Amino acid sequence: MKRCGLLGEKLGHSYSPAIHAELADYDYRLYEVAPEKLGEFLKDGEFDGLNVTIPYKKAVIPYCAALSPIAQKLQSVNVLVRRADGTLYGDNADAYGFDAMVKASGISVEGKKALVLGSGGASATVCAVLNELRARSVTVISRSGEDNYGNLDRHADAEIIVNTTPVGMYPNCGVSPVDLRQFPRLAGVLDIVYNPARTALVMQAETLGIPYMSGLYMLVAQAKRTAEVFEGHAILGSETERIWKKLGREMQNIVLIGMPGSGKSTVAARLAEALDRVALDSDAEIEERNGASCASLIERNGEAAFRALESEVIADLGRRSGMVIATGGGCVTREENYASLHQNGVIFWLRRDLDKLPREGRPLSAGDLGAMYNKRRACYERFADYSVDNNGTVEETLRQIMAVLSEGEK
């Protein structure tokens, strides 16, 4: 079996092994190598093929006996193959990946003015692809160059924006490199960040009705191209779409919202068990962090202080991936919680008749539940992707949710 993997200095969690397992039958592992050990590893390491990531895409070039035309042009290598004579061949699959991402997005860049945010290694690749796709002009925005974030007004006529910076990437979610409202002619936003699934930049594009795409498709497409180089034969293009959808589903959080006592925690636990996922509960997390029940925290400090604690917890839970998350009934009263939950999640509103909602141990439910519901209803509607009736059995509710999730697999 071929020995392949991902080379970098600090890798942490990577989706690459899971993607490559879908593409080919070779061993794919992570290789964390310190800069001072890079040369030794490349000369003597026992590998047949490598992906290369930060900070080594240029550093590996002197160790290559030959480069592909695209790697030579970009002076960036993210694929290494050890040839039969022991020498290294360098290639670049990032350009293929970004090109595939643009085409899958349906966003046309031909004849349009494009801004590329960031001047790092990915920026050069993106610029090359945009030029190949016949963008009218391509301008790099950096922190200190001639075109920078302080004079973006020069480019208010931009029609395409591509983010190549790590701004908004996990774990520092919720921040954006630019405010898209500065660009009234925008026709498309592309963000090569793939974790979270929707960055703050992408969510603003979504809100403004601007076509967009996140970076997961690029990651999968470049992995397909890498596997073709490793294996020496073509792989069906449809595999990119299949794996992209599969990985997207696996990374997606399933979020439950609804009135206090509507069954969110119970359904979350059963759903997590059925899907072999981890169930998280924002109320339970608040209580764990503060050493007191939610009811006592509200009674002691007031609802506003409690909501601030809740938003902190939801921000932490929402940046995780592949979880089932039960939320507190009032989380929808804070708009900031929507972004935290939506960035990685599909949101289900569990609906239960008011006369079936328990009140004991819930200080905010002690009053007029009808008034509370009427006040929150628009918020639940705003947050929810889907609405599920939870007046029957847990099994019936699970079937409704699973039916929605299954439909998304098609």
Language-model regions: role of each:
Residues 2-105, 196-198, 204, 208, ...:
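Phosphate/diphosphate ligand-binding glycine-rich loop within oxidoreductases
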Residues 343-379, 386:
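A glycine- and Lys/Arg-enriched "phosphate-lid" helix/loop adjacent to the NTP-binding pocket
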Residues 281-342:
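ATP-dependent small-molecule kinase phosphotransfer cores
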Residues 241-249, 254, 270, 274, ...:
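NTP-dependent small-molecule kinase module
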Residues 147-212, 331-337:
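Rossmann-like adenosine-cofactor binding region
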Residues 132-149, 283-290:
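NAD(P)-binding Rossmann-fold cofactor-contacting core
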Residues 8, 92-95, 102, 111-132, ...:
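Glycine-rich adenosine-cofactor-binding loop
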Residues 192-252, 390:
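Adenosine-phosphate binding glycine-rich loop
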